[in-house]
Design a protein with these regions (language model features):
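An N-terminal structural lobe/cap that precedes and organizes the functional/catalytic core
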Residues: 1-33, 38-55
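A two-mode feature
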Residues: 57-246
Length: 246
């Protein structure tokens, strides 16, 4: 996310890509051409040094493991009165799984577990849920029973959470929430967002509008260093064709 006007964006594009004939910048297309790599770096340097920016880097595999813990582990502990999220335990356990899981459990088998989890969340059928439980049981799960025991033992709380309508492994909303959290911190007052046309944004348009319209004063703290306060300073989110806006 970059706080920049169309005129300034056009000027930077002309300055760093004077020979470019395309109506819009496409990173993947430019990055494939060696002659454009240095201008890309210089453009990024100019934007980062001269304008307010929010950059969000997401490791999708780590995020998937976090989601696995949210739905295939946490409900088991909640049912027994344990706060799985206390002191960032979910992040610590996700980091452990991400780092040692492939070595301790076998790379292929661990990958199969994550794939089975994605399929179970998407399909929500008894067959897909059984396949997830079987994938967990094929692992040497007693090596990490606190993370793998609930699903390996077929915890009904976890299976019910995974089968809940609306539960998804889509990372788009996580990214949107993270960007919004940081933009709220950086913005001195009301602001609006213009976004390139996106199916993901259309999917979450109604939810974003509910966020924007929320008037009750409340703060949600995601971690020790991240929180978001309502009402938002964000006033609107609109989609535009990037061919018509630099």
């Amino acid at each position: 996310a970059v706080s920049i006007g169309d005129d300034e964006a056009s000027r930077l594009i002309r300055e760093h890509f004077p020979k470019l004939q395309a109506p819009e910048l496409k990173y993947h297309a430019l990055a494939r051409r060696p002659g454009y790599r240095q201008p890309l770096i210089e453009l990024q340097r100019a934007v980062l040094s001269q304008h307010m920016c929010v950059t969000y880097v997401c490791d999708k595999r780590f995020l998937l493991i976090l989601m696995f813990l949210d739905y295939a582990v946490e409900p088991f502990y909640y049912e027994r009165g344990e706060d799985f999220y206390k002191d960032g335990q979910n992040y610590a356990l996700a980091s452990l799984l991400y780092t040692v899981g492939p070595t301790l459990l076998g790379t292929a088998a661990f990958d199969d577990l994550l794939v089975a989890f994605q399929r179970a969340v998407k399909a929500k059928t008894p067959q897909a849920l059984d396949a997830l439980v079987n994938a967990a049981r094929k692992l040497n799960w007693p090596e990490l029973p606190e993370a793998l025991g609930p699903i390996a033992l077929g915890s009904p709380e976890c299976l019910s959470a995974i089968a809940t309508p609306g539960v998804s492994t889509d990372a788009a909303m996580v990214v949107l929430q993270s960007l919004t959290t940081r933009m709220e911190v950086m913005a001195a007052g009301p602001y609006r967002v213009e976004h390139d046309q996106s199916e993901n944004l259309l999917t979450y348009h109604d939810l974003l509008q509910r966020y924007i319209r929320h008037e009750d004063v409340v703060t949600f703290r995601q971690s020790e260093i991240a929180s978001i306060t309502f009402p938002l300073k964000l006033q609107s989110v609109t989609q535009i064709d990037s061919k018509h806006s630099p």
